[in-house]
Regions:
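Short, surface-exposed polybasic-aromatic patches that bind anionic ligands, especially phosphate groups
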Residues: 1-158
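Charged, long alpha-helical assembly modules
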Residues: 164-171
Length: 171
């Protein structure tokens, strides 16, 4: 586990959302070369070092934000977004937003605020949450037009010397 860079949340978040009980900050982190996240926003990010990994396999929204959020294999969120006025580039903004939403998904910990408080303050992550709720669960893996496994049936016409196979597609 390696800390990469410290990120301080924009100062105006706390000013516009008084429910936030402290000045938020986090670290961009990697674990075995992959982006990793602190899932409890009000706690300090652990120091760099060796830690046992915990697998979270029963939380659909955590899976989705790790998959579709910053650094995920199907990242589609926060591209082209940067809080430049707050000194954050696109990667830092994507990491920060993914961290906030993962903390909400995992522990509900938003340093005293909730998603509606952030929305009223103009932070606007509620629509992202709702969008991700509608995305496919990445744990389902591939499925096919024939079900969970590809079912291929080939036939051979000896008279015309033609083999035919049914068409199977990914869903």
């Amino acid at each position: 586990f390696t800390r990469i860079k410290s990120i301080t949340y924009p100062e105006w978040w706390k000013r516009k959302c008084p429910q936030i009980t402290k000045q938020w900050s986090t670290y961009m982190c990697k674990y075995n070369g992959q982006w990793s996240y602190c899932l409890e926003a009000s706690k300090r990010t652990p120091s760099s070092g060796n830690y046992a990994a915990n697998v979270i396999n029963n939380n659909v929204m955590v899976r989705k934000f790790l998959y579709y959020g910053f650094g995920g294999p199907a990242q589609c969120l926060f591209k082209g977004q940067a809080l430049k006025d707050d000194g954050l580039n696109e990667a830092e903004t994507g990491y920060l937003y993914t961290h906030v939403l993962l903390s909400l998904a995992y522990s509900g910990d938003m340093c005293g605020a909730n998603i509606d408080d952030l929305e009223r303050a103009g932070i606007g992550l509620k629509s992202t949450w709702q969008y991700v709720e509608g995305l496919p669960d990445p744990s389902n893996g591939a499925n096919f037009s024939t079900g969970d496994t590809a079912s291929l049936k080939a036939t051979f016409d000896k008279a015309n010397m033609i083999q035919t196979t049914n068409t199977v597609s990914f869903n």
